[in-house]
Amino acid sequence: MPKVAVGGTFQYLHDGHARLIEKAFEIAGDGKVYIGLTSDEMLQKNHSIDNYENRRVRLLEYIDEMEIPKEKYEITRLNDPCGPTVEEDFDYIVVSPETYPVALKINRIREKKGKNPLEIVYVEYVMAEDGTPISSTRIAKGEIDRHGKMKRESQA
């Protein structure tokens, strides 16, 4: 049964996050998805991001809305970018263009430890109405909503 890793800060659960999470569950099939959620300690420089527990609750609510059984996933705290993927046995890692370099680093570390590399599943960005990627930063700035719809005209 496949073990699939996916990770992120998940500040604003937007359509890009949805695509990543859905892909992870699709690949897992009868296996399990391990969702690494960035810890407060890792984000200590960015005070505009909600605390770990609030982000965790929103993530749990989102997965519950997907009607995924609790035994099919586990949320783990990420205290570093690689999390448990360098030590534990996983089969896949689902990444965005932003997190792809981390997956390459994880596989280099795994190779040095004599572990099999993870199969990297690359998920493209989801684009907003204006053709640029949906991101939590853009949502926080009030440019777009979580579905990529424009909220106001961009300041040129």
Curated annotation (Swiss-Prot):
GO biological process: coenzyme A biosynthetic process
Cellular-component GO terms for this entry: cytoplasm
EC code(s) of this entry: 2.7.7.3
Coiled-coil ranges per UniProt: none
Pathway entry: Cofactor biosynthesis; coenzyme A biosynthesis
Pfam families in UniProt: CTP_transf_like
Catalysed reactions, semicolon-separated: (R)-4'-phosphopantetheine + ATP + H(+) = 3'-dephospho-CoA + diphosphate
Disulfide bonds: none
Key words, A-Z: ATP-binding, Coenzyme A biosynthesis, Cytoplasm, Nucleotide-binding, Nucleotidyltransferase, Transferase
Alphabetized CDD domains for the sequence: PPAT_CoAS
Subcellular location: Cytoplasm
GO molecular function, one term: ATP binding
Primary residence: cytoplasm
Gene3D superfamilies for this protein: HUPs
SUPFAM superfamilies associated with the record: Nucleotidylyl transferase
Domain of life: Archaea
Recorded family membership: Belongs to the eukaryotic CoaD family.
Function as written in the Swiss-Prot or TrEMBL entry: Reversibly transfers an adenylyl group from ATP to 4'-phosphopantetheine, yielding dephospho-CoA (dPCoA) and pyrophosphate.
Protein name: Phosphopantetheine adenylyltransferase
Organism: Methanosarcina acetivorans (strain ATCC 35395 / DSM 2834 / JCM 12185 / C2A)
